[in-house]
Design a protein with these regions (language model features):
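Outer-membrane beta-barrel domain signature, strongest for Gram-negative TonB-dependent receptors
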Residues: 1-66
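Surface-exposed loop/turn segments flanking beta-strands in extracellular/periplasmic regions
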Residues: 2-16, 65-109, 158, 206-214
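Residue-identity detector for threonine
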Residues: 2-4, 18-19, 33, 39-43, ...
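Alpha-helix-centered segments that form part of catalytic cores
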Residues: 14-33, 99-122
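Short N-terminal secondary-structure initiator segments
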Residues: 23, 31-41, 81-100, 195, ...
Length: 214
């Protein structure tokens, strides 16, 4: 009711517990590494046409994990709520009855521990036309986006890397403009875009499973 948190009561509860801390604090870590290459070529065709084209390459790796930072008066923590979901066929360590009840301390990983990877390759082009009061353009692009993950908690080393899934995307756009005078113009643009889904929606649960949507 007061908007405060009774840490002393939590510490007393954890200290009295014979099965480890009931409440702890962990930090969510999300470390991102990006690399990219964008190269563009431009040229003219005659006096009225301008052409632009290029490639767009991108690579992403994201480390996602939760690490215990405070046991709040307890001596250890048991992450049974998450470890009970680790399947033996994915991680052989789960065959040990003690796996679910392993005593964890500050610095140990809970809940999630995986790397997410994204690789994208694309090409694009645009042709523009300009003559007097009239201008027009048409453009398009194609891309291939690949997603995969590497999990260190729910999967052992033999199964840690998921299969890659590739999504082909593309777009096409066009438009025309006519300047009626110095202050007024009329124009029309249209386009269609098909892009890859977000990384998280490629997996049923990207936090703990290689299983895919679709």
């Amino acid at each position: 009711e007061t908007g405060t948190f009774a840490y002393d009561e939590v510490e007393a509860m954890n200290a009295a517990s014979t099965t480890g801390s009931k409440m702890i604090m962990s930090k969510a870590m999300n470390n991102h590494t990006w690399y990219g290459l964008l190269s563009t070529y431009t040229t003219k065709f005659g006096e009225n046409f301008d052409f632009y084209g290029g490639i767009d390459l991108r690579y992403y790796k994201g480390l996602h994990q939760n690490v215990i930072t405070d046991l709040f008066g307890g001596s250890y923590f048991v992450d049974i709520d998450n470890r009970k979901n680790v399947r033996v066929e994915n991680n052989a360590a789960a065959a040990d009855p003690n796996f679910k009840n392993q005593k964890l301390g500050v610095g140990d990983v809970i809940y999630r521990d995986y790397d997410g990877f994204v690789m994208s390759e694309g090409v694009f082009a645009q042709l523009e036309y300009n003559y007097d009061k009239l201008s027009a353009f048409v453009s398009g692009g194609l891309s291939n986006t690949s997603y995969w993950r590497y999990d260190r908690l729910y999967y052992d080393k033999a199964h840690a890397k998921s299969d890659k899934k590739h999504y082909l995307g593309g777009n096409v756009k066009g438009g025309i403009n006519y300047n009626l005078n110095e202050y007024n113009n009329i124009y029309f643009n249209a386009g269609y875009i098909n892009r890859a889904p977000m990384f998280d929606t490629s997996f049923i649960n990207s936090q703990n499973s290689h299983a895919r949507n679709g």
